[in-house]
Amino acid sequence: MPFNKHAIVIGVGPGLGAALVQKCVREGMKVSAGARDRDRLRNLLDERGLHEVPALACDVTDPASVQSAFDDAIADAGTPDLVIFNASGYARGSVLELTPGQLEAAWRVGCLGGFHVGQAAAKAMVGAGTGTILFTGATASLRGSANFAPFAIAKFGLRALAQSMARELGPKGIHVAHVVIDGQIGEAEGDAKLKPADIAEAYWSLYRQPRSAWTIEADLRTWVEKF
């Protein structure tokens, strides 16, 4: 049943991003979805039966693109109550062979992009004194594995951003949380991978938390994952 709330999900692809959009729609929210390639996003949303969800062009590395996406979303559906940053810059390779450009590209999407989206979300929410901002992390948020320096650097930085924003914005009524996805995401049979729909349920629980018991960081993994 609709309850007149607005969610903006940035970094929507066929896995977790689409599952987050679907969950918010099922719960009755007005949802705006953003990704770098608007046409591809529109096709994905239509394939999932999400015809009513606007597809926004949003290059998270470009602050003007992010602000334009937020302006369009807010004009269409009002101030966001929930913003999810789900974009990620993935790169791997030996530190002996990686180029500065590869490292910077991963950081610009995964960390700087989080700043652009988080800042736009905070500016939209602060006047209302309420809202939730969620950042998607990974195992690499906590551990830099061999050959994953660019990804880990971006994810470490995103986690630091989320922590800083949580401490600054919490007293202003805005709930900021970082979610560590500790494992691979997919629809494989059994429990070897985290299922997108199940992760989306966890995000929804964070959004619905009462102010007296906010989670600032959550880590999700399958029951068979070693940690």
Predicted features along the sequence, with ranges:
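Substrate-binding pocket helix/loop in short-chain dehydrogenase/reductase
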Residues: S94-V95, Q102-W107
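Catalytic loop of short-chain dehydrogenase/reductase
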Residues: T132-G157, Q163, G170, I185
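Conserved glycine-rich cofactor-binding loop
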Residues: G13-P14
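Conserved glycine-rich Rossmann-like NAD(P)H-binding loop of the short-chain dehydrogenase/reductase
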Residues: E27-N43
